[in-house]
Protein backbone atom coordinates (compact mmCIF):
# COMPACT_ATOMS: atom_id res chain seq x y z
CA UNK A 1 0.00 0.00 0.00
CA UNK A 2 1.33 3.42 -0.96
CA UNK A 3 1.28 6.42 1.36
CA UNK A 4 2.86 9.83 1.64
CA UNK A 5 6.33 10.03 3.15
CA UNK A 6 7.25 12.94 5.41
CA UNK A 7 9.93 15.05 3.75
CA UNK A 8 12.57 17.44 5.03
CA UNK A 9 14.57 19.67 2.71
CA UNK A 10 17.99 21.22 3.11
CA UNK A 11 20.00 23.41 0.80
CA UNK A 12 23.76 23.60 0.54
CA UNK A 13 25.49 26.92 0.08
CA UNK A 14 28.45 27.99 -2.03
CA UNK A 15 30.20 31.29 -2.32
CA UNK A 16 30.94 31.58 -6.03
CA UNK A 17 28.50 29.42 -7.98
CA UNK A 18 24.73 29.72 -7.89
CA UNK A 19 23.14 27.07 -5.69
CA UNK A 20 20.32 25.06 -7.30
CA UNK A 21 17.19 24.59 -5.22
CA UNK A 22 15.03 21.49 -4.86
CA UNK A 23 11.25 21.84 -4.92
CA UNK A 24 7.96 20.18 -5.87
CA UNK A 25 8.92 17.02 -3.99
CA UNK A 26 6.49 14.11 -4.05
CA UNK A 27 7.11 10.75 -2.42
CA UNK A 28 5.41 7.37 -2.23
CA UNK A 29 6.36 4.19 -0.42
CA UNK A 30 5.65 0.58 -1.18
CA UNK A 31 7.05 -1.77 1.43
CA UNK A 32 10.74 -0.89 1.72
CA UNK A 33 10.86 0.88 -1.66
CA UNK A 34 10.57 4.66 -1.79
CA UNK A 35 9.80 6.57 -5.01
CA UNK A 36 10.60 10.28 -5.13
CA UNK A 37 9.95 13.02 -7.69
CA UNK A 38 11.35 16.54 -7.47
CA UNK A 39 12.31 19.55 -9.53
CA UNK A 40 15.57 21.46 -9.63
CA UNK A 41 15.23 25.22 -10.08
CA UNK A 42 17.26 26.81 -12.86
CA UNK A 43 20.21 28.89 -11.56
CA UNK A 44 21.87 28.78 -14.97
CA UNK A 45 23.82 25.57 -14.41
CA UNK A 46 23.35 21.98 -13.22
CA UNK A 47 23.78 20.87 -9.63
CA UNK A 48 24.41 17.74 -7.59
CA UNK A 49 21.41 16.36 -5.69
CA UNK A 50 21.85 13.93 -2.80
CA UNK A 51 19.53 12.38 -0.24
CA UNK A 52 19.62 11.24 3.36
CA UNK A 53 17.30 8.79 5.08
CA UNK A 54 15.98 10.21 8.35
CA UNK A 55 14.15 8.79 11.32
CA UNK A 56 12.46 11.35 13.54
CA UNK A 57 14.56 14.06 11.96
CA UNK A 58 17.95 12.37 12.42
CA UNK A 59 19.97 10.54 9.80
CA UNK A 60 19.85 6.77 10.20
CA UNK A 61 23.05 5.47 11.80
CA UNK A 62 23.46 2.60 9.32
CA UNK A 63 23.86 2.07 5.59
CA UNK A 64 20.58 3.42 4.21
CA UNK A 65 19.90 1.61 0.97
CA UNK A 66 20.58 -1.61 -0.89
CA UNK A 67 20.16 0.10 -4.25
CA UNK A 68 19.17 3.38 -5.87
CA UNK A 69 18.13 4.27 -9.39
CA UNK A 70 17.32 7.46 -11.24
CA UNK A 71 18.43 11.06 -10.85
CA UNK A 72 19.98 11.12 -7.39
CA UNK A 73 23.51 11.35 -6.02
CA UNK A 74 24.62 12.74 -9.38
CA UNK A 75 24.93 15.89 -11.45
CA UNK A 76 21.51 16.82 -12.84
CA UNK A 77 20.21 19.59 -15.08
CA UNK A 78 17.44 21.97 -14.05
CA UNK A 79 13.97 20.48 -14.51
CA UNK A 80 11.87 17.57 -13.26
CA UNK A 81 13.49 14.39 -11.97
CA UNK A 82 12.71 11.14 -10.18
CA UNK A 83 14.51 8.39 -8.32
CA UNK A 84 13.79 5.38 -6.16
CA UNK A 85 15.63 3.49 -3.47
CA UNK A 86 15.21 0.40 -1.35
CA UNK A 87 15.71 0.85 2.38
CA UNK A 88 18.40 -1.48 3.74
CA UNK A 89 17.50 -4.13 6.29
CA UNK A 90 19.67 -2.42 8.88
CA UNK A 91 17.30 0.56 8.93
CA UNK A 92 13.72 0.75 10.11
CA UNK A 93 11.07 0.26 7.46
CA UNK A 94 9.53 3.55 6.23
CA UNK A 95 6.86 4.86 8.59
CA UNK A 96 4.61 7.83 7.91
CA UNK A 97 5.29 10.58 10.41
CA UNK A 98 8.62 9.14 11.54
CA UNK A 99 10.63 8.51 8.40
CA UNK A 100 11.92 11.38 6.31
CA UNK A 101 14.09 12.05 3.30
CA UNK A 102 16.32 15.08 3.11
CA UNK A 103 17.29 16.26 -0.37
CA UNK A 104 20.27 18.58 -0.70
CA UNK A 105 21.35 20.51 -3.78
CA UNK A 106 25.05 21.28 -4.13
CA UNK A 107 26.84 23.81 -6.33
CA UNK A 108 29.46 22.31 -8.61
CA UNK A 109 32.27 24.15 -6.81
CA UNK A 110 31.18 22.80 -3.41
CA UNK A 111 30.37 19.11 -3.93
CA UNK A 112 29.47 16.57 -1.20
CA UNK A 113 32.01 14.88 1.04
CA UNK A 114 32.17 11.61 -0.89
CA UNK A 115 32.60 10.95 -4.60
CA UNK A 116 32.47 7.44 -6.10
CA UNK A 117 33.74 6.61 -9.58
CA UNK A 118 32.63 3.44 -11.35
CA UNK A 119 35.89 2.25 -12.90
CA UNK A 120 34.13 0.02 -15.43
CA UNK A 121 31.37 2.33 -16.68
CA UNK A 122 32.84 5.74 -15.85
CA UNK A 123 29.72 6.81 -13.93
CA UNK A 124 30.34 9.34 -11.13
CA UNK A 125 28.14 9.67 -8.05
CA UNK A 126 28.32 11.83 -4.93
CA UNK A 127 27.18 11.02 -1.39
CA UNK A 128 26.83 12.88 1.90
CA UNK A 129 28.39 10.05 3.93
CA UNK A 130 29.53 6.45 3.64
CA UNK A 131 26.12 5.41 5.03
CA UNK A 132 24.65 6.65 1.75
CA UNK A 133 26.71 4.23 -0.36
CA UNK A 134 24.38 1.49 -1.67
CA UNK A 135 24.84 -2.25 -1.23
CA UNK A 136 26.45 -2.33 2.18
CA UNK A 137 28.63 0.77 2.05
CA UNK A 138 32.38 0.40 2.53
CA UNK A 139 31.96 -3.17 3.82
CA UNK A 140 31.22 -4.23 0.23
CA UNK A 141 34.40 -5.13 -1.66
CA UNK A 142 32.85 -3.52 -4.73
CA UNK A 143 34.27 -0.26 -3.33
CA UNK A 144 37.74 -1.80 -3.25
CA UNK A 145 37.76 -3.21 -6.78
CA UNK A 146 35.25 -1.87 -9.33
CA UNK A 147 34.60 1.52 -7.74
CA UNK A 148 36.89 4.23 -6.39
CA UNK A 149 35.77 6.11 -3.25
CA UNK A 150 37.12 9.63 -2.75
CA UNK A 151 36.78 11.84 0.36
CA UNK A 152 36.66 15.64 0.16
CA UNK A 153 39.41 17.13 2.32
CA UNK A 154 38.46 20.51 3.89
CA UNK A 155 41.60 22.38 2.85
CA UNK A 156 40.28 25.69 1.44
CA UNK A 157 41.50 28.52 3.67
CA UNK A 158 43.20 26.11 6.09
CA UNK A 159 46.72 26.53 7.45
CA UNK A 160 48.62 23.73 9.17
CA UNK A 161 52.09 22.97 10.48
CA UNK A 162 53.83 20.68 8.01
CA UNK A 163 56.84 18.70 9.21
CA UNK A 164 57.84 17.45 12.65
CA UNK A 165 58.33 19.18 15.97
CA UNK A 166 61.49 18.92 18.08
CA UNK A 167 59.70 16.64 20.57
CA UNK A 168 59.44 13.78 18.04
CA UNK A 169 62.19 11.37 19.07
CA UNK A 170 63.14 10.05 15.62
CA UNK A 171 62.54 13.12 13.46
CA UNK A 172 64.75 13.58 10.41
CA UNK A 173 65.34 17.30 10.73
CA UNK A 174 66.83 17.84 7.27
CA UNK A 175 63.68 16.58 5.49
CA UNK A 176 61.00 17.39 8.07
CA UNK A 177 61.55 21.09 8.76
CA UNK A 178 58.40 22.42 10.43
CA UNK A 179 56.73 25.23 8.47
CA UNK A 180 53.27 26.66 7.86
CA UNK A 181 51.31 25.66 4.74
CA UNK A 182 48.00 27.08 3.48
CA UNK A 183 45.59 25.92 0.78
CA UNK A 184 43.17 27.77 -1.47
CA UNK A 185 41.00 24.79 -2.50
CA UNK A 186 39.51 21.63 -1.11
CA UNK A 187 40.52 18.42 -2.84
CA UNK A 188 39.40 14.80 -3.01
CA UNK A 189 41.63 12.03 -1.68
CA UNK A 190 41.23 8.27 -2.00
CA UNK A 191 39.59 6.71 1.05
CA UNK A 192 41.71 3.62 0.36
CA UNK A 193 45.09 3.07 -1.20
CA UNK A 194 44.62 2.10 -4.85
CA UNK A 195 44.01 -1.65 -4.87
CA UNK A 196 45.18 -4.33 -7.25
CA UNK A 197 41.61 -4.79 -8.45
CA UNK A 198 41.30 -1.10 -9.30
CA UNK A 199 44.74 -1.06 -10.93
CA UNK A 200 43.77 -3.99 -13.18
CA UNK A 201 40.44 -2.38 -14.09
CA UNK A 202 42.32 0.68 -15.34
CA UNK A 203 45.54 -0.70 -16.83
CA UNK A 204 44.52 -4.26 -17.66
CA UNK A 205 47.60 -5.78 -16.02
CA UNK A 206 48.70 -6.56 -12.47
CA UNK A 207 52.28 -5.51 -11.72
CA UNK A 208 52.07 -6.28 -8.00
CA UNK A 209 54.33 -8.68 -6.17
CA UNK A 210 51.53 -9.93 -3.89
CA UNK A 211 49.08 -10.74 -6.69
CA UNK A 212 48.55 -14.46 -6.13
CA UNK A 213 46.72 -14.32 -2.80
CA UNK A 214 43.03 -15.10 -2.45
CA UNK A 215 42.30 -11.52 -1.39
CA UNK A 216 44.82 -9.86 -3.74
CA UNK A 217 42.18 -7.74 -5.58
CA UNK A 218 41.46 -5.97 -2.27
CA UNK A 219 45.10 -5.54 -1.28
CA UNK A 220 46.89 -2.35 -2.29
CA UNK A 221 48.62 -2.32 -5.65
CA UNK A 222 52.30 -2.77 -4.79
CA UNK A 223 55.58 -2.48 -6.67
CA UNK A 224 53.99 0.54 -8.38
CA UNK A 225 56.20 2.84 -10.43
CA UNK A 226 55.30 6.51 -10.59
CA UNK A 227 55.71 6.42 -14.36
CA UNK A 228 52.85 3.89 -14.67
CA UNK A 229 50.58 6.18 -12.65
CA UNK A 230 51.17 9.52 -14.41
CA UNK A 231 53.80 9.02 -17.10
CA UNK A 232 55.60 12.33 -17.43
CA UNK A 233 58.10 13.33 -14.76
CA UNK A 234 58.08 17.07 -15.42
CA UNK A 235 56.21 18.12 -12.25
CA UNK A 236 56.15 20.88 -11.15
CA UNK A 237 57.28 22.58 -14.40
CA UNK A 238 54.41 21.22 -16.49
CA UNK A 239 51.85 20.92 -13.72
CA UNK A 240 49.38 18.06 -14.02
CA UNK A 241 50.43 17.11 -17.55
CA UNK A 242 49.90 13.36 -17.99
CA UNK A 243 51.20 10.91 -20.58
CA UNK A 244 48.75 8.96 -22.76
CA UNK A 245 48.27 5.43 -21.46
CA UNK A 246 49.12 6.18 -17.83
CA UNK A 247 46.64 5.20 -15.13
CA UNK A 248 45.50 8.73 -14.22
CA UNK A 249 44.97 9.66 -17.88
CA UNK A 250 42.89 6.53 -18.48
CA UNK A 251 40.82 7.18 -15.36
CA UNK A 252 40.18 10.80 -16.32
CA UNK A 253 39.16 9.87 -19.86
CA UNK A 254 36.81 7.18 -18.59
CA UNK A 255 34.93 9.30 -16.03
CA UNK A 256 35.36 12.82 -17.39
CA UNK A 257 37.25 14.15 -14.35
CA UNK A 258 40.60 15.13 -15.81
CA UNK A 259 42.23 16.39 -12.60
CA UNK A 260 43.07 12.91 -11.26
CA UNK A 261 46.72 12.72 -10.23
CA UNK A 262 48.89 12.01 -7.23
CA UNK A 263 48.51 14.40 -4.29
CA UNK A 264 51.23 16.90 -3.55
CA UNK A 265 53.43 16.27 -0.53
CA UNK A 266 51.58 18.98 1.40
CA UNK A 267 48.15 17.65 0.45
CA UNK A 268 49.12 14.16 1.58
CA UNK A 269 50.39 15.31 4.98
CA UNK A 270 47.41 17.60 5.58
CA UNK A 271 45.03 14.73 4.81
CA UNK A 272 47.04 12.34 6.98
CA UNK A 273 47.15 14.62 10.02
CA UNK A 274 43.42 15.34 9.63
CA UNK A 275 43.40 18.40 11.86
CA UNK A 276 46.14 17.33 14.27
CA UNK A 277 49.88 17.98 14.38
CA UNK A 278 50.81 14.51 15.57
CA UNK A 279 52.82 11.59 14.28
CA UNK A 280 49.87 9.22 14.49
CA UNK A 281 46.08 9.49 14.89
CA UNK A 282 44.40 10.19 18.24
CA UNK A 283 47.05 12.73 19.24
CA UNK A 284 49.94 10.28 19.54
CA UNK A 285 53.35 11.91 19.30
CA UNK A 286 56.45 9.83 18.77
CA UNK A 287 58.04 10.71 22.10
CA UNK A 288 59.46 8.59 24.90
CA UNK A 289 56.05 7.12 25.76
CA UNK A 290 56.64 4.21 23.41
CA UNK A 291 53.92 1.93 24.73
CA UNK A 292 51.11 4.34 23.89
CA UNK A 293 52.55 4.94 20.44
CA UNK A 294 52.91 1.28 19.58
CA UNK A 295 49.35 0.71 20.73
CA UNK A 296 48.15 3.53 18.49
CA UNK A 297 49.88 2.55 15.27
CA UNK A 298 48.80 -1.08 15.59
CA UNK A 299 45.18 0.12 15.51
CA UNK A 300 45.70 2.26 12.41
CA UNK A 301 48.30 0.60 10.21
CA UNK A 302 50.29 -2.42 9.07
CA UNK A 303 54.04 -2.14 9.68
CA UNK A 304 56.95 -4.44 10.46
CA UNK A 305 55.71 -5.38 13.94
CA UNK A 306 52.24 -6.62 12.92
CA UNK A 307 52.16 -7.31 9.15
CA UNK A 308 53.66 -10.82 9.10
CA UNK A 309 51.58 -13.82 8.04
CA UNK A 310 53.26 -17.18 8.69
CA UNK A 311 56.47 -15.31 9.35
CA UNK A 312 56.43 -13.21 6.16
CA UNK A 313 55.73 -9.46 6.24
CA UNK A 314 53.22 -8.48 3.56
CA UNK A 315 50.56 -5.91 2.61
CA UNK A 316 47.00 -6.49 3.79
CA UNK A 317 43.50 -5.77 2.53
CA UNK A 318 42.80 -2.05 2.53
CA UNK A 319 40.43 -0.70 5.15
CA UNK A 320 41.02 -3.37 7.80
CA UNK A 321 42.43 -0.93 10.35
CA UNK A 322 40.78 2.17 11.84
CA UNK A 323 40.48 5.30 9.65
CA UNK A 324 41.81 8.69 10.65
CA UNK A 325 39.53 11.58 11.65
CA UNK A 326 38.64 12.28 8.01
CA UNK A 327 37.81 8.70 7.13
CA UNK A 328 41.03 7.77 5.32
CA UNK A 329 42.36 4.25 5.84
CA UNK A 330 45.95 2.95 5.88
CA UNK A 331 47.65 6.33 5.92
CA UNK A 332 50.26 4.70 8.17
CA UNK A 333 51.94 1.60 6.76
CA UNK A 334 50.61 -1.08 4.37
CA UNK A 335 52.25 0.44 1.27
CA UNK A 336 54.32 3.59 0.92
CA UNK A 337 52.47 6.16 -1.19
CA UNK A 338 53.91 8.23 -4.03
CA UNK A 339 53.32 11.99 -4.03
CA UNK A 340 54.14 14.47 -6.77
CA UNK A 341 57.00 16.41 -5.21
CA UNK A 342 60.70 16.07 -5.92
CA UNK A 343 62.65 14.71 -2.96
CA UNK A 344 64.72 17.59 -1.59
CA UNK A 345 66.35 18.04 1.81
CA UNK A 346 67.04 21.24 3.73
CA UNK A 347 64.27 23.13 1.95
CA UNK A 348 64.24 26.81 2.91
CA UNK A 349 61.09 28.06 4.69
CA UNK A 350 62.91 30.75 6.68
CA UNK A 351 60.76 33.77 5.79
CA UNK A 352 58.15 32.66 8.33
CA UNK A 353 55.13 33.15 6.06
CA UNK A 354 52.80 30.26 5.20
CA UNK A 355 53.61 28.59 1.90
CA UNK A 356 50.43 28.62 -0.21
CA UNK A 357 49.55 25.55 -2.32
CA UNK A 358 53.18 24.37 -2.45
CA UNK A 359 54.32 22.22 -5.36
CA UNK A 360 57.70 21.27 -3.92
CA UNK A 361 61.24 21.81 -5.12
CA UNK A 362 61.87 22.43 -8.82
CA UNK A 363 64.40 19.59 -8.84
CA UNK A 364 65.42 16.69 -6.63
CA UNK A 365 68.47 16.97 -4.40
CA UNK A 366 69.02 13.21 -4.70
CA UNK A 367 69.40 11.86 -8.23
CA UNK A 368 65.89 12.66 -9.50
CA UNK A 369 64.04 10.92 -6.68
CA UNK A 370 60.40 11.63 -5.81
CA UNK A 371 58.81 11.55 -2.37
CA UNK A 372 56.99 8.56 -0.89
CA UNK A 373 54.89 8.90 2.27
CA UNK A 374 53.36 6.86 5.08
CA UNK A 375 55.73 3.92 5.40
CA UNK A 376 54.93 0.33 4.49
CA UNK A 377 54.23 -3.13 5.85
CA UNK A 378 57.99 -3.68 6.10
CA UNK A 379 58.86 -0.34 7.66
CA UNK A 380 59.59 0.42 11.30
CA UNK A 381 57.23 2.60 13.28
CA UNK A 382 59.36 5.74 12.91
CA UNK A 383 59.02 5.52 9.11
CA UNK A 384 55.21 5.38 9.27
CA UNK A 385 54.61 8.79 10.83
CA UNK A 386 52.59 11.62 9.31
CA UNK A 387 55.75 13.58 8.53
CA UNK A 388 58.37 10.99 7.47
CA UNK A 389 59.33 11.21 3.80
CA UNK A 390 61.54 9.03 1.67
CA UNK A 391 62.99 9.46 -1.81
CA UNK A 392 62.50 6.77 -4.48
CA UNK A 393 63.42 6.59 -8.17
CA UNK A 394 60.64 7.65 -10.56
CA UNK A 395 60.48 4.51 -12.68
CA UNK A 396 62.91 2.26 -10.88
CA UNK A 397 62.67 -1.48 -11.44
CA UNK A 398 63.96 -1.96 -7.88
CA UNK A 399 60.94 -0.46 -6.17
CA UNK A 400 60.10 -3.40 -3.97
CA UNK A 401 56.63 -4.44 -2.85
CA UNK A 402 56.32 -1.50 -0.47
CA UNK A 403 55.48 1.12 -3.11
CA UNK A 404 51.85 2.00 -3.77
CA UNK A 405 49.65 4.99 -4.46
CA UNK A 406 46.60 6.93 -3.29
CA UNK A 407 44.88 9.13 -5.87
CA UNK A 408 43.67 12.71 -5.55
CA UNK A 409 41.72 15.21 -7.67
CA UNK A 410 40.17 18.67 -7.44
CA UNK A 411 36.91 19.07 -5.53
CA UNK A 412 35.30 20.98 -8.39
CA UNK A 413 32.88 19.30 -10.78
CA UNK A 414 33.55 20.09 -14.43
Language-model-detected regions and their locations in the chain:
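Surface-exposed recognition segments
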Residues: 173-180, 284-286, 331-414
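Short, compositionally biased
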Residues: 11, 18-20, 100-205, 249, ...
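Extracellular acidic, Ser/Thr/Pro-rich low-complexity tracts
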Residues: 40-45, 55-57, 89
